Every structure is written in C-alpha cells, then in structure tokens.
Amino acid sequence: PSNGIFILLTSKLNLLLNTIISRCQIIRFRSFSGKQVNSILKDYLDTSKFNINKKLKIQDLINSANGSPSLLLKNIEIWNELSDEITNKLDSPIKNSLEILEVSKLISEQLEIDQQICLVNLIQIIWWRKTKNVYLLKTLEKLKSYLRKNIQPRLSWEITFLKISMENI
C-alpha cells in the first residue's frame, strides 16, 4: 500500500543493514529508572496485595524489572503464585542435597519455563544482595541458558543447585 507504515523494533540497531537503517526514522526508547518504576508502583498499585516478605523486598522486584513496569507486574504475579514451600527455601543458597531435589521438583512441576526464568532472575537478585558472590550469578545465568534451550528443567535446577551447594558460600 502506498500509505502503509511498517514499524521495525530492535534492541540491537547495529545488527541491521545500513540500507534498512537509512530508510527508517529512528526513535530511541529508554527504560524507566528505578525511581520512576517505584513511583509507578506506589501511585497505581495496591502494594498490600503483594505477598512480599523478608526474602523479597520491593526494591528487589524493581531491580528485576529492568525499568519495565509490565515486567514488574509479571514478576509480582509470578512471586505471588509461588508456593511457600518454594519461597521459604530460596532465601539463600541451599546446602542440603535432599532439599535441593525437593525444591527442583516443586519448581519444575509448578512453573512454566518462562516463569522459571523469571524466578531465576529474582533468585539472582536476592542472593546477590545477601552474598555479593559473582560465581552464584554466573551459575544462575547458565541455568537460564539451560531453561531457554529446553534442557530438562528439573535436571537443570538440580545440577545448578548442587554446583552451588558444593561451593563455600
């Protein structure tokens, strides 16, 4: 059509061909700052409905959203759907092998893959706040990679938690 508009969205402009870029009107979008997301959260949401306890702070959720209010809502929803069995054990890295197997089973049975990846993000933030251990973050990043590649979720969680438990954290 002569009056048609084609909208092309990308997070990696440098990967597009110059011939494509030259024909586009570039509009750069930026994420909201943590303060802006916090303001949105306070102004538009009833925080009393959140199942947030000592393990997960509002600031952890804001950090996990990376400036996206919709991702913040998704993370809150996923956190609220988690059973207490899971949240109670994810306060810090698990050391007991039996608990690792139990939690891995619960996570893989109760959550879809995208929810599991979101949970990994939240775990990273909680554990980073408590331990400041880079190894933990790298190991959990590998877990996200395994989950995205559709490697058996339960096995992925078990291997990751067991690796972490063998480290002196």
Task: Specify the residue positions occupied by each region the protein language model found.
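Charged, glycine-rich active-site and insertion segments that engage polyanionic ligands
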Residues: 2-5, 12-122, 126-169
